[in-house]
UniProtKB/Swiss-Prot annotation:
The lineage of its organism: Eukaryota, Metazoa, Chordata, Craniata, Vertebrata. Keywords: Adaptive immunity, Cell membrane, Disulfide bond, Glycoprotein, Immunity, Immunoglobulin domain, Innate immunity, Membrane, Receptor, Signal, T cell receptor. This is T cell receptor gamma variable 5. Residues 1-17 form the signal peptide. V region of the variable domain of T cell receptor (TR) gamma chain that participates in the antigen recognition. Gamma-delta TRs recognize a variety of self and foreign non-peptide antigens frequently expressed at the epithelial boundaries between the host and external environment, including endogenous lipids presented by MH-like protein CD1D and phosphoantigens presented by butyrophilin-like molecule BTN3A1. Upon antigen recognition induces rapid, innate-like immune responses involved in pathogen clearance and tissue repair.
Length: 118
């Protein structure tokens, strides 16, 4: 049986971070297992040095998946995550795309992007 995944994208704006300015604030993406998904984060931040990606699943604390080091064009994965599962693509200035590969049911949740100085 093929499972479909629902990925909710929410972009919050706490005082200590900058976040996406997507109209409506939340988008939904559904993809079959073993496929890929792309999540776009558009930030109008002139001095963005690090773009952080988080996953929040029901009943669990948010988990940082990775951060993208803008100056070095490099993803830094959190320990324990599979290399090649997540990576960031930057198609244009102030836009970052998180790509999730080989989706499984456990990838369902709410994904956040944020920028911090470090």
């Amino acid at each position: 049986m093929r499972w479909a995944l629902l990925v909710l994208l929410a972009f919050l704006s706490p005082a200590s971070q900058k976040s996406s300015n997507l109209e409506g604030g939340t988008k939904s993406v559904t993809r079959p297992t073993r496929s890929s998904a792309e999540i776009t984060c558009d930030l109008t931040v002139i001095n963005a040095f690090y773009i952080h990606w988080y996953l929040h699943q029901e009943g669990k604390a948010p988990q940082r998946l990775l951060y993208y080091d803008v100056s070095n064009s490099k993803d830094v994965l959190e320990s324990g995550l599979s290399p090649g599962k997540y990576y960031t693509h930057t198609p244009r200035r102030w836009s970052w795309i998180l790509i999730l590969r080989n989706l499984i049911e456990n990838d369902s949740g709410v994904y956040y992007c944020a920028t911090w100085d470090r």
